[in-house]
Amino acid sequence: MLPGLGADRLEIVPGAWHLRHYLSPAEQLAIATQCLELGARDAGFCTPIVRGGHPMSVRMLCLGRHWNARTYTYEDVRSDIDGLPAPALPPDLARLASRAATAAGFALVPDLCIVNWYGASSRMGLHQDKDESRESLLSGAPVISFSIGDSARFLFGGLKRKDPVQKLLLESGDAFVFGGESRLRYHGVTRILPGTGPADLGFEGRLNLTFRQY
């Protein structure tokens, strides 16, 4: 049986699934180690500057394609950071994301991943993931989110910013999958709970990997 099935597989709304304890401790450690190693290299973790000149509160690593925080578009090089090519998306990470999509009833072959490293004071305001291609958005290709490290208070709303939101706790090893009719729902992170992650991961804070199909 795939991880995430059975009692730990919760449908939040049609098209959105919380797969609790989806990743094994060994998988969490392997993902954290790989992301930290990639993030320490050239074209590694950076602090994006958004429109208006304000830095985001997370550090970001883009794999497969780079997300430009000033233009809200994807590109092959980090033109808003250092001009370096975006690192490739490791096949083993892509396979894990495809497996999670299957566990939630979707099919996905991701070609990019955004890794956000949350510190104790990091937040992410309500937003839609809508910068992928028109074809991808129209098809409802899901976003696959993995949480590694400290727990996060997560909001999942509707198709309008002012719609009611559901409040969830995402813990280390959880996957959250949203696609189909829920693909463009607003979501965000209001709080990180320091010290709640597994002690053996080798870092502080929370790594959030979101896999997409451009």
What are these regions (language model features)?
Residues 1-214:
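Non-heme Fe(II) oxygenase metal-center motifs and adjacent flexible, charged/small-residue loops
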